[in-house]
Swiss-Prot record:
Name of encoding gene: GUCY2C
Transmembrane stretches, start-end: 431-454
Record topology, Extracellular segments: 24-430
UniProt domain comment: The protein kinase domain is predicted to be catalytically inactive.
Stretches of the chain found on the membrane's Cytoplasmic side: 455-1073
Record-stated family: Belongs to the adenylyl cyclase class-4/guanylyl cyclase family.
Function text: Guanylyl cyclase that catalyzes synthesis of cyclic GMP (cGMP) from GTP. Receptor for the E.coli heat-stable enterotoxin; E.coli enterotoxin markedly stimulates the accumulation of cGMP in mammalian cells expressing GUCY2C. Also activated by the endogenous peptides guanylin and uroguanylin.
Taxonomy, superkingdom: Eukaryota
Name the record gives this protein: Guanylyl cyclase C
Signal peptide boundaries: 1-23
The species this protein was found in: Homo sapiens
InterPro entries: A/G_cyclase, A/G_cyclase_CS, Cyclic_nucleotide_synthase, GC-C_PK, Kinase-like_dom_sf, Nucleotide_cyclase, Peripla_BP_I, Prot_kinase_dom
UniProt keyword annotations, A-Z: Cell membrane, cGMP biosynthesis, Disease variant, Endoplasmic reticulum, Glycoprotein, GTP-binding, Lyase, Membrane, Nucleotide-binding, Receptor, Signal, Transmembrane, Transmembrane helix
Length: 1073
């Protein structure tokens, strides 16, 4: 079985990409009045005779379809493409090994561009299941066979032979029946004989009965599978047998070969499943003596195929297979006729999903399909008459309505009194003895009930008198400041959330505890609430958190509950970094989590608390040893449950709590654990309130449940998946209890230990070691991320403050002010900035300044200077501080000023085309003081007369000129750099009087593309000229149809993200040290 499932996965990977072309091929072969059917022909045990007989059946069906379409006035062509398996590649004499064969045939059809409108075949369950997955639910499939449970409830698959699901429904119905003259007992036990040599149909029928999570197993109290012939033979006369009923599958010859002439106990009933054999209804057939203890389950006979050319030499079982292929053709013809008459396209998903919940005219009469496309039929239960030695009909069963109809009310059975015996041995003692024992038992029971009631009354009285554990507030201690709440590997934890967590965590009796708000103000609990609290005190179980009592703090009442270090299960599932899927949270760990919750709930349901009422993944917590514990139980009269995604549908409709409601909540949690997705994950709905509404209001439709992807489950996962689906059944009575859930998971969990030859403690230690290694890796990884983040922060600081200042702040926490003997300071501003703002929107002004100053910043980066600040349109730069650089400060400022002026000669505004932007530049050198001012948003500021003079040099300058003081020129003369300058003459500087100033015009042997400054010297004329330029620019914009840009939320993103947002981790050494 495991090998086959691995084949399924492998072939899915190999062939899945090829099916993407199905839709185009189907469109080619299903249009313009020509429709093609793809028929897969596979030779195996399901149809051992020559495949030519199946081809004859298909051809006969095609002739019938063509005639029916012609009679309906539809002039279309219907043909079939036959694809045969390659016996040299696939030597599969058994359907149970034909997975690859079916996929290979499908690939051949696809490569040949002959993909038809519908796929007929194969009969093998494995092949059908895999091909259904690979056609991606968009292609109709009709199968003659595919009996297994894995092919149930497939949206585009139709099965024309009775599947195992129908057989289970009959057996459960018959077992429960107890109101017939010949069956007065309900049965609840059975043996199932299965040796692995059965035919294809029998293999899957018995496989369904064997599955521990199937409907049949769920309804029976006892079921044992017999796998050896000797086991079957021993049961026939074993007085200690647990059941009188044995189910097997095959014909009378198979039974005789197994049983022979051995004696059989008089209470034994053998149910022989032989559905596809109508020889029992022949007039000349006599039942052999060994069939007297046997009830034969078969299908109602059909004689239409007996004289057909293609089936004349076939065995009865093979005739049914051939008939299914033929009816598959007729079914397609029926649906094709309907769609063509309605003018609809058959290559749409609607056609693929239409083969269900209908009745069509088959070869031997009407054929009915149920809501899932499975054929409905009439099953017949036969018995051997001891008078006539003939097979007679005992009852019939209609699979469509799931109802039994008795036929022979006075059968001549071999069993005593012509009644079917009880299924359990030894239920036939004398009536007097039954009466004696019954009376004795009733008296004992009454005495026991009276004793229990008296005991319960005394305990309840004690509980009412006893005061629950109310802890004095002085025994609750806050956590120490050096105690952390939980281990966290995130470097950006929310400190506010951490503070709230601290308020809810305290210490009691030297243990860390959680304080649960009970929404109670005064602590005067009612009698019922006191009983609930006392019940909680008595619970002490490994998978349930301990309740220590209540405490009153301020005006609030808290429950004091055991603390679990790793937080809730929901948090663990969300943390894919600390608990990765591949190395830690594997399938075995998920099973152990489910097992822990099931054990805790099983104990809780058997305790006095009886029910949880608020079970969800956030109420399941994980301790330091990775053990899952349930919390927040009890106190249902204090904290009534609310509607949530975990709430059972019956409690959404009517507020209540129940054990079956807890089982539903467990199913939702199990889906979270298995898929590790959000609560109630489903692709069809994302909104929480809508999910709750759809669960509450099913309105007779298919119940709304989260996705579980049963089709892709591996073999080891399938049993758990089916268990989860049973937990969220709409009918609460169909849900298993936690005892059964615990038993099932214990068996599955035990298999892991047996395979690895290790105990539970070995597994726990191994998991903690694995977690420790993973934690070390994560700590190392987070350390690297921290260092990278620290370097990123340093780079950002260096853009705001000088490097030496940042280093001093990090090392000392402050920067000492310092006096610098000689520095050079640069000032510039935009001429006519106020006028430009008048004709621009605020966002256009921001865009303009951002474009200009980003370019200034790039120029500044190439010189040994420090950008001090920008205020409006003013730009201030200094050199020679905080790191002294000799005479370089004047050279760097001068070169920088020339490059900035050269750039401004090429700059043009987008919203005012043609308008030149004029700037004034002033430069001055001298002493100044510098230091960091303030704590919030600290800034490195300059102080002294040099700063004021540099500002005066700018304000007294002219547009597109670099106004330089005499002190700066004197420093430049002391250097080897030959700067070009002109004497401006005497200039009045406020606070300093008249001084000789200069125009910096360039540098020898280096060309700067400086703009030509305006020739007008008079200030008023300059303003008039600038106003004329703006007016011309506005006319150009209007003529070109350029509209003012609408304000943008982040104007600076226009030409790329701000540089400080582009900072990333760096490979350079950190500057932290």
């Amino acid at each position: 079985m495991k090998t086959l499932l691995l084949d399924l996965a492998l072939w899915s990977l190999l062939f899945q990409p090829g099916w993407l072309s199905f839709s185009s091929q189907v469109s080619q072969n299903c249009h313009n009045g020509s429709y093609e059917i793809s028929v897969l022909m596979m030779g195996n045990s399901a149809f051992a005779e020559p495949l030519k007989n199946l081809e004859d059946a298909v051809n006969e069906g095609l002739e019938i379809v063509r005639g029916r379409l012609q009679n309906a006035g539809l002039n279309v062509t219907v043909n079939a493409t036959f694809m045969y398996s390659d016996g040299l590649i696939h030597n599969s004499g058994d359907c149970r090994s034909s997975t690859c064969e079916g996929l290979d045939l499908l690939r051949k059809i696809s490569n040949a561009q002959r993909m038809g409108c519908v796929l007929i075949g194969p009969s093998c369950t494995y092949s059908t299941f895999q091909m259904y997955l690979d056609t991606e639910l968009s292609y109709p499939m009709i199968s003659a066979g595919s009996f297994g449970l894995s092919c149930d409830y497939k949206e585009t698959l139709t099965r024309l032979m009775s599947p195992a699901r129908k057989l289970m429904y009959f057996l459960v119905n018959f077992w429960k029946t107890n109101d017939l003259p010949f069956k007065t007992y309900s049965w609840s036990t059975s043996y199932v004989y299965k040796n692995g040599t059965e035919t294809e149909d029998c293999f899957w029928y018995l496989n369904a009965l064997e599955a521990s999570v199937s409907y049949f197993s769920h309804e029976l109290g006892f079921k044992v599978v017999l796998r050896q012939d000797k086991e079957f033979q021993d049961i026939l006369m074993d007085h200690n047998r647990k059941s009188n009923v044995i189910i097997m599958c095959g014909g009378p010859e198979f039974l005789y070969k197994l049983k022979g002439d051995r004696a059989v106990a008089e209470d034994i009933v053998i149910i022989l499943v032989d559905l596809f054999n109508d020889q029992y209804f022949e007039d000349n057939v006599t039942a052999p003596d060994y069939m007297k203890n046997v009830l034969v389950l078969t299908l109602s006979p059909g004689n239409s195929l007996l004289n057909s050319s293609f089936s004349r030499n076939l065995s009865p079982t093979k005739r049914d297979f051939a008939l299914a292929y033929l009816n598959g053709i007729l079914l397609f013809g029926h649906m094709l006729k309907i769609f063509l008459e309605n003018g609809e396209n058959i290559t749409t998903p609607k056609f693929a999903h239409a083969f269900r919940n209908l009745t069509f005219e088959g070869y031997d009469g009407p054929v009915t399909l149920d809501d899932w496309g499975d054929v409905d039929s009439t099953m017949v239960l036969l018995y051997t008459s001891v008078d006539t030695k003939k097979y007679k009909v005992l009852l019939t069963y209609d699979t469509h309505v799931n109802k039994t109809y008795p036929v022979d009310m006075s059968p001549t059975f071999t069993w005593k009194n012509s009644k079917l015996p009880n299924d359990i041995t030894g239920r036939g003692p004398q009536i007097l003895m039954i009466a004696v024992f019954t009376l004795t038992g009733a008296v004992v029971l009454l005495l026991l009930v009276a004793l229990l009631m008296l005991r319960k009354y005394r305990k309840d009285y004690e509980l009412r008198q006893k005061k629950w554990s109310h802890i004095p507030p002085e025994n609750i201690f806050p956590l120490e400041t050096n105690e952390t709440n939980h281990v966290s590997l995130k470097i950006d934890d929310d400190k506010r959330r951490d503070t709230i967590q601290r308020l809810r965590q305290c210490k009691y009796d030297k243990k860390r505890v959680i304080l649960k708000d009970l929404k109670h103000n005064d602590g005067n609990f009612t009698e019922k609430q006191k009983i609930e609290l006392n019940k909680l005190l008595q619970i002490d179980y490994y998978n349930l958190t301990k309740f220590y009592g209540t405490v009153k703090l301020d005006t609030m009442i808290f429950g004091v509950i055991e603390y679990c270090e790793r937080g809730s299960l929901r948090e663990v599932l969300n943390d894919t970094i600390s608990y990765p899927d591949g190395t830690f949270m594997d399938w075995e760990f998920k099973i152990s989590v489910l097992y822990d919750i099931a054990k805790g709930m099983s104990y809780l349901h058997s305790s006095k608390t009886e029910v949880h009422g608020r079970l969800k993944s956030t109420n399941c917590v994980v301790d330091s040893r990775m053990v899952v514990k349930i919390t927040d139980f009890g106190c249902n009269s204090i904290l009534p449950p609310k509607k949530d995604l975990w709430t059972a549908p019956e409690h959404l409709r009517q507020a209540n709590i129940s054990q079956k409601g807890d089982v539903y909540s467990y199913g939702i949690i199990a889906q979270e654990i298995i898929l590790r997705k959000e609560t109630f994950y489903t692709l069809s709905c994302r909104d929480r309130n809508e999910k709750i509404f759809r669960v509450e209001n099913s309105n007779g439709m298919k119940p709304f449940r989260p996705d579980l992807f049963l089709e892709t489950a591996e073999e080891k996962e399938l049993e758990v998946y089916l268990l989860v689906k049973n937990c969220w059944e709409e009918d609460p009575e169909k849900r298993p209890d936690f005892k059964k859930i615990e038993t099932t998971l214990a068996k599955i969990f035990g298999l892991f230990h047996d395979q690895k030859n290790e105990s539970y403690m070995d597994t726990l230690i191994r998991r903690l070691q694995l977690y420790s290694r993973n934690l070390e890796h994560l700590v190392e990884e987070r350390t690297q991320l921290y260092k990278a983040e620290r370097d990123r922060a340093d780079r950002l600081n260096f853009m705001l403050l000088p490097r030496l200042v940042v280093k001093s702040l990090k090392e000392k926490g402050f920067v000492e002010p310092e006096l610098y003997e000689e520095v050079t300071i640069y000032f510039s501003d935009i001429v006519g900035f106020t006028t430009i703002c008048k004709y621009s929107t605020p966002m256009e002004v921001v865009d303009m300044l951002n474009d200009i100053y980003k370019s200034f910043d790039h120029i500044v980066d190439h010189h040994d200077v420090y950008k001090v600040e920008t205020i409006g349109d003013a730009y201030m730069v200094a050199s020679g501080l905080p790191k002294r650089n000799g005479n370089r400060h004047a050279i760097d400022i001068a070169k920088m000023a020339l490059e900035i002026l050269s750039f401004m000669g090429t700059f043009e505004l987008e919203h005012l085309p043609g308008l030149p932007i004029w700037i004034r530049i002033g430069v001055h050198s001298g002493p100044c003081a510098a230091g960091v001012v303030g704590i919030k948003m600290p800034r490195y500021c300059l102080f002294g007369d040099t700063v004021n003079t540099a500002s005066r040099m700018e304000s007294t300058g002219l547009p597109l000129r670099i106004h330089v003081s005499g002190s700066t020129i004197a420093i430049l003369k002391r250097t080897e750099c030959q700067f070009l300058y002109e004497v401006r003459g005497e200039t009045y500087l406020k606070g300093r009087g008249n001084e000789t100033t200069y125009w910096l015009t360039g540098m020898k042997d280096q060309k700067f593309n400086l703009p030509t400054p305006p020739t007008v010297e008079n200030q008023q004329r300059l303003q008039a000229e600038f106003s004329d330029m703006i007016a011309n620019s506005l006319q150009k914009r209007q003529a070109a149809g350029i509209r003012s840009q609408k304000p943008r939320r982040v104007a600076s993103y226009k030409k790329g993200t701000l540089e400080y947002l582009q900072l990333n981790t760096t490979d350079k050494e950190s500057t932290y040290f």
